[in-house]
Amino acid sequence: MATALGVRYSEGLYKNPFIGRTFIMPGQRARKKSLRYKLTPQFTEISEKKVMIVDDSIVRGNTSREIVRMLKDFGATEVYFAVACPPVQSPCFYGVDMPTRAELIANNKSVDEIRQYLNVDLLFYQHIDDLAEAVMRKGDHHIDRPCMACFDKHYITSEMNNKKIQQLESMRINDRNGN
């Protein structure tokens, strides 16, 4: 990204490789605590600078918001956020344990509302057509139709309707609560 923009790349946040994905951790308290151990801001790379965060996704938005707050606390003058996928609007029921629709920030807010919630100057998402094109590019393996349900709410199996989604979400909530 830095090369394409013609700017110097540097790591303003050092990542602890021993802390896992925060979006799948149970409870906001655990996610917030883990984030403090996961990322270490580098003052000289952040203070008095325009900063761009590049992340694979924004799920709930809480982790992203904390990262932005951390950068601003360390003196970033402007914060831009680039996301490598489209807004995550719906849960995946094909193997990824994701939050419910109500917990997904993009299911409830527009891109501009998310930008305001995160408190960033600019927010960029990958366009779904560009992501699909990148996934379907011919190579050793050809994919005719990738599942993009978490981005476009169009599930590839016919039995996925609103009632089924609600049932699956209820099961996940019960599992989280130990029921």
Predicted segments with their positions:
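PRPP-associated nucleotide enzymes
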Residues: 1-179
